Structure formats: structure tokens, C-alpha cells
Amino acid sequence: MIRKIIVVLIAILVPPAVYAQETGEPHVSKELLIIGTMHEVPSIVSRSYRPLLKFAKKYQPEAIFVEDIRPCDTLSLKNFTPRLLNTADSLFRAEGIDEERFLELKKKQLAELEPDDFAFLANTYLKKRDRANYSYYNYLKTYGMAGSKKALRNENGDLICPLAISIGATELIPVDDHKTEKEYQQAWSNTAKAGKETGDAQIMADLLKKDRHKRVWPSLWGKLGKYTNKQETLQRFYLINSCRYVTQPNEWSNAARQLWDDRNYRIAENLTEQIKKNPYQKNILIIGAGHVISLKTILGQMYPELKIKLMSDKK
């Protein structure tokens, strides 16, 4: 009787263990916090990223995903950062890469790296076409582990790099995609022009005006970052970026909407692939605020097991 009970228990317990070995995924609920950014901010509101950094540090992420193009995505690099691509490839041809030293340094903890290591890694990541990690190690080379005392007025210098240092991150994970950048910009611009005749241009103008008025008070109190991540603000940016404010659709507005959705779908695919592959439970994505609504919706369909969090969520 005891032997039968043991056999039954083994039959129940073994399949999950085998599954875990086959997939490589630990049985842990994974989550993603998405923080929307303002990109570069005016000097008058230079400290706007402070509340976002405080919020992100409190979350204590284990992996940081950023709005930069993956090094393997040559088409996006050509479309969006051609100068970086040309510089990277020219340096690679002229100098090559010391892969042995690079791999040795990747084994070390962030606190173990020396200033000359930061310089080497910045140069190496540049030659590898990795702008995200080039920017990170260039920041470390310039300001050290203590970081910049002065606000740099952008998400890299005031949010991403300080956050990465605080958790001891040695690598950022880029997930952006710009394969159809030119087509999207043309469609969006033509939609705006067509809106002057249909009256939709006034709708967009009203959305922008409402945003300008509502951001004044938060900006004065150093809370522009928090305002940007309110649900109402994110929804406005979503409507404008995807041309969903349009009441009389045309070929250009339809194209802009589709291209915007497709870009965010590809970003979501990149995120899903990396989050499933990595062992971390708590992940954070730092990306332009206009993407937040799109990505939350798409990820909810693509990766329903992933728990998605926003700053605006009720505690």
C-alpha cells in the first residue's frame, strides 16, 4: 500500500519537474513595470526624472529594458541611427574587438570594474552597434559609480543609468524597433496635413493644448514625470501617436495607425522573448510615454502570464 502511494506521488510530482527542465523556465510569476518617459526635458524642469527614479528604485527590478535598437537589427539602425551604425562599423574594421577581454569583464560584478574597464566596454559596445550599453558605460566612464551630480535632462542620464548602477546591472537590454520609421513619419505627417481640411487637426490641437495646461502645475512642483505616467496623459499620447484621434479616417491615418501598432507589436515580441529567456522575476521597461498603452494591450494578449504594472495602478 505504501509503495502504491509513493508511485502515485512520483507520478504527480515528476511532470512539473520535467517540464521545468525542458523549458528552462522556473516556476515563478514574472512581472514587468512599464515607466513612460518625456525624453529630453527643458532646463527649467531639469529635475523631472527624480520621482521616476525614486519609484523605479523602490520597485527593485532585476533586469532593465530600454528604448534602444537591438544590435542585430541592421534595418532599424539604418533607418534611425545611421551615423552610429557607420561609426560602429568603421571602428570595428579599423580596430577589431578584443573579445577575450570583453568576455572576462562580463563575468565581473559592476563594483569590480575599474575606470579603464568602463572606457573599454563603452568602446566595445559601440563597435558592437549596441547604443544602450555604449551609453551606459560611457556614463560610467564620465561620472563613475557615484553618477552625475547635475541633472542631464534625459532618461538615460537621470533615470536609466542611475537605476542600473543602483542594482549593480552590468548590461541593459534594448528592445526597440524602427524598421518602418520613414513610412510611419510620412503617414503621420500626411494625416496631420489632411486633418486641416477635415477638422481633425483641431482635435489634435485640443489634445496638445489640454496637455500643456495640465502639465504646468506638476512641472512647477517637480512632478512632471508622475504627471506623464497618469492614465489620462498616457491615453492622450496614445491617441496622438497612433492617429486614433482622427474622426474621418483616410489612407494616411489608417497607415499611421497600422505602422504604430506593428512597431509596438515587434517591441512586445522582443520583450516577450527576453523576459521568457531570462531568469528574472521583476523586470522594468523604460520607454517613451506614447508607447505605454499600446504595449500593455499587446503584451496582455501575447504574454498573458506576464503581470504588467504601471505607475498609475492603484496600490
What are these regions (language model features)?
Residues 1-28:
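Bacterial Sec-dependent N-terminal signal peptides
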Residues 10-11, 56, 299:
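Residue-level detector of alpha-helical hydrophobic segments embedded in or interacting with membranes
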Residues 14-15, 48, 78, 299:
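Single-residue recognition of alpha-helix boundary sites
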Residues 15, 169-172, 280:
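Intrinsically disordered or highly flexible coil/loop and linker segments, enriched in small
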Residues 17, 47, 263-266:
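Short secondary-structure boundary/capping elements
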Residues 23-247:
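Structured, acidic catalytic/metal-binding patches in enzyme active sites
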Residues 242-315:
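A cross-kingdom marker for long, charged
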